[in-house]
C-alpha cells in the first residue's frame, strides 16, 4: 500500500489560497483604477505586516486590504482588529519610505471580493487609532 503524504492537501490548499488572493488583488486594483485611483504599490511587505494595495486619488492615499471569501459578509468579517493593527504598522513603514505622501489625506479601506458579485469598496473601513 502506498504511503500518503498528509501535508499535501495543506500545501495544495495554501497554493489555491495564494492564487485566489492574487486574483482578488488584481480585481480590486482594476476596480480602483476604474474609479480614478492610481496604484502606487501592490503587496507591500514589512516584517510587521503587509498592505495589499496602496492607491492614490488626488490628495488621498488609501491603504487597501483585499478580502476574498465565498460571500461578502464573510469577507467583511475577515479583517480582524489584529490584522488592522498590522496594516497600520505596514502603512507607517510605507510612508517612511515615501515621505512625499506624508502630508496626504490617509485612509484605510477594504475591498471585498466574492463570487458572482462586483467588488465592494469600503472607504474608511477602519482607522489608525488603537
UniProtKB/Swiss-Prot annotation:
User: What PANTHER family does the record point to?
Assistant: UPF0102 PROTEIN YRAN
Enumerate the NCBIfam families for this protein: PRK12497.1-3, PRK12497.1-5, YraN family protein
The family classification in the record reads: Belongs to the UPF0102 family.
- State the species of origin: Rhodopseudomonas palustris (strain ATCC BAA-98 / CGA009)
The record, for Gene3D superfamilies, names: 3.40.1350.10
* Stored Pfam families: UPF0102
This one is known as UPF0102 protein RPA0323
Q: Which HAMAP family match?
A: UPF0102
InterPro entries assigned to the protein according to its UniProt record, in alphabetical order: Restrct_endonuc-II-like (IPR011335), tRNA_endonuc-like_dom_sf (IPR011856), UPF0102_YraN-like (IPR003509)
Q: Which domain of life is it from?
A: Bacteria
One term of GO molecular function: nucleic acid binding
